[in-house]
Amino acid sequence: MPKRTTHTYSSEDAAPDGPDSDLFVYYCKHCGSHVLITDTQLQKMPKRKTDRSNVLDKKTHLARLNVSEGGKVLLKRGEGKMERQFRMNCIGCELFVCYRAEENLETASFIYIVDGALSAVAAETNPQDAPVPPCISQLDGGLVQVAIEVEDRAQRSAITRVNADDVRVTVAAPAARGEANNELLEFMGRVLGLRLSQMTLQRGWNSKSKLLVVEDLSARQVYEKLLEAVVP
């Protein structure tokens, strides 16, 4: 996974012709962060047939992006063809929101905006209005799974971030002796208002990753309780 470095990109090509020209601001549909300023509406852009992404032509339209680099991805397309995508993420929550075919953003002809990733309405005023992020998923049987990144040996138990990829939780206990798991379960029980018997902790995809499976709450309820508990 490439290291993500945050940048603010802008393209002054095809700037509006005067002070009365319309500008459209688009926000991340998940967290409400500002992502794109352009002089055309999203619904008027052509769509790719392969993934239904909106195609923004930088040669004819303004494209001011506020994103971070998400790395290069190779995708298999039909007839053995490979497609190269240089992905860009929302700065606020790191959700994949758009991509380009060329490595250099300034010389790229087109920006492809992921279908459904952006909104003309900012959700910043009320984060609870944002969609439930992918790290909190509804499972069969009424269960909800939460992807957690655990930081051990912290000063105290706390939730410090909720984004698309995971919920970051700090615990005071060291991870090596397994004490961190017990502290994590007890803390999450207090945050979610659940008993230990209503939660199961599973291994994730690396040493810091955990998967918490909970009962008797919906994904939306879990998300809202976690948001309320986040500390700066």
From Swiss-Prot:
Subcellular location: Nucleus speckle
InterPro entries, per the entry: DUF167 (IPR003746), UPF0235 (IPR053323), YggU-like_sf (IPR036591)
A GO CC term attached to the entry: nucleus
Disruption phenotype: No visible phenotype.
Biological process (GO), any one: mRNA processing
Keyword terms of this UniProt record: mRNA processing, mRNA splicing, Nucleus, Spliceosome
UniProt function note: May play a role during early embryonic development. Probably involved in pre-mRNA splicing.
NCBIfam families to which the protein is assigned, alphabetical: DUF167 family protein
Family: Belongs to the UPF0235 family.
Official protein name in the record: UPF0235 protein At5g63440
Organism: Arabidopsis thaliana
The organism's taxonomic lineage, starting at the top: Eukaryota, Viridiplantae, Streptophyta, Embryophyta, Tracheophyta
